[in-house]
A protein has these predicted regions:
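Feature primarily recognizes SF3-like P-loop helicase cores of small DNA viruses
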Residues: 1-188
Length: 188
């Protein structure tokens, strides 16, 4: 099954299981065609040529692995990742995380820990990120905890965790650009 969605801005998907992101291929067409140059019959022309287009694709990709390799390369391209970052705040937030080889990084934390400490707790960092970027509806801790491991796969990062007496510790730390970009400052 092929679903083609054409839009001027990146589409947002509520699915956090990874089902859509594993299958979605983003192709950008950034060039805007001036209104006076647009073909009002374009859709009908494409529909009329669909059989030829499909036949051409079938001839071009006689080996399914060739087509799959090209689609997967586009799926994980920098261009596609930038579009996903602009469409999904969690993908954008995860782009500001750096993986560690062991779970010695940020603790997950929760919303009740006061004062907020985004340099120590992953969930606090996420809340600070959302506030700094003007996003009005952050995820609950439970939804965040379920979505982060799947979202990190966009960056080919596996989340490692361990239980400690201070809470659950992750294999993530904040990247250096967070300090200047969105972390709260302590300019006394």
């Amino acid at each position: 099954m092929v679903i083609l969605a054409v839009n001027n801005s990146p589409m947002r998907f509520g699915d956090r299981s990874g089902g859509v992101s594993r299958r979605r291929v983003i192709l950008t067409f950034p060039e805007v065609i001036p209104a006076k140059e647009r073909d009002p019959q374009l859709l009908e022309k494409i529909a009329g040529e669909l059989a030829v287009i499909v036949r051409h694709l079938m001839q071009r990709f006689t080996r399914l692995d060739d087509a799959r390799a090209l689609l997967q390369a586009q799926q994980s391209s920098e261009e596609a990742l930038e579009i996903k970052r602009s469409a999904d705040p969690l993908v954008d937030f995860c782009g500001d995380l750096t993986p560690l080889s062991t779970p010695t990084g940020l603790f997950i934390g929760n919303a009740n820990i006061r004062p907020m400490n985004p340099r120590r707790y992953l969930y606090h960092a996420y809340l600070s990120f959302m506030e700094a970027r003007g996003h009005q509806h952050p995820m609950s801790l439970t939804a965040f905890g379920q979505a982060v491991p799947q979202t990190l796969k966009e960056y080919e990062i596996e989340l490692l965790k361990r239980k400690t007496k201070n809470g659950i510790q992750t294999s993530l730390e904040l990247s250096e650009n967070c300090e200047a970009d969105w972390l709260p400052r302590c300019d006394g």
